[in-house]
């Protein structure tokens, strides 16, 4: 299903070639500043993994990855990654990262089962996937919030860089970020859907880190949103959201979490009815204490470019596939799809 919101009197303010130059600048500058601020080292990342490894991201649990086999078939089924959430934790151990050190990657994924293609959602996903080694004693809300604050400040700093080069296009971001839990939103607006609650709180606060995503909420007995049970700790995770004036909606730029430890892994797999995953190599390594405790997440590259440049559609900052009807409507509205 495809949906399209067209801002009234939309003006892209930049030609396609100007936009392409700005995209390159944002990507190159942000990854350098982000890596420095977080003490992260860029490493190479796979586009596909073995299904049998258990390293692919199961997302909400029902999406099927694009898969294939090699000519001789000896490696079994290979899957295009949905994200590198579990692979990164394995890489921290494999590459010898120590406490306080971490990695980030340039992750490209295909999510063919994306339910709705709209201004923010594409079948093509590009993000900076990152992961950092922490101590078990640092598996706290304070650690999570300190990390969120550092990432928010890096994004805010990028606004100033972009404004200096492209003053006509730069989107203004709020000065501060607020922290709120999904339970608090449900208690405040019980009759609204989770996405409507996000819109409400983001319009009120400007920028929000929404915590506790994946576990059942007190009133509805349903999660605010689905999260895979084998990497995010549902009590120590969240989404970084901005109010986005051009589309009059909440705008997610990043999702992050302190990762499950041995106990939370088993608890959440049981709640999700997915205890069969415990036999997979990744999960066995985690249970045996062979993987480091970590915090990690993903920052959308196209999402960040779209936000900082005030674009109306993610197709203005990434090359993807869109239904003909969407392409025609975008052309009529001066939305320049790449």
From Swiss-Prot:
GO biological process: any one? L-asparagine biosynthetic process
The UniProt entry, under InterPro entries, shows:
aa-tRNA-synth_II (IPR006195), aa-tRNA-synth_II/BPL/LPL (IPR045864), AsnA (IPR004618)
GO cellular component assignments: cytosol
What reactions does this protein catalyze?
L-aspartate + NH4(+) + ATP = L-asparagine + AMP + diphosphate + H(+)
Identify the EC number(s).
6.3.1.1
At the top level, the lineage of the source is Bacteria
The pathway that the record names for this protein is: Amino-acid biosynthesis; L-asparagine biosynthesis; L-asparagine from L-aspartate (ammonia route): step 1/1
Where is it chiefly localized?
Answer: cytoplasm
Which range is the signal sequence, renumbered to this chain?
none
Where in or outside the cell is it found? Cytoplasm
Provide the species name.
Lactobacillus delbrueckii subsp. bulgaricus (strain ATCC 11842 / DSM 20081 / BCRC 10696 / JCM 1002 / NBRC 13953 / NCIMB 11778 / NCTC 12712 / WDCM 00102 / Lb 14)
Kindly list the cysteine pairs connected by disulfide bridges.
none
GO MF term list: aspartate-ammonia ligase activity; ATP binding; catalytic activity, acting on a protein; transferase activity
Similarity comment: family membership: Belongs to the class-II aminoacyl-tRNA synthetase family. AsnA subfamily.
Q: What is the lineage of its organism?
A: Bacteria, Bacillati, Bacillota, Bacilli, Lactobacillales
Q: What is this protein called?
A: Aspartate--ammonia ligase
PANTHER family hit by this protein: ASPARTATE--AMMONIA LIGASE
Which UniProt keywords are present, listed alphabetically? Answer: Amino-acid biosynthesis, Asparagine biosynthesis, ATP-binding, Cytoplasm, Ligase, Nucleotide-binding
The answer to keyword Nucleotide-binding applying to this record is: yes
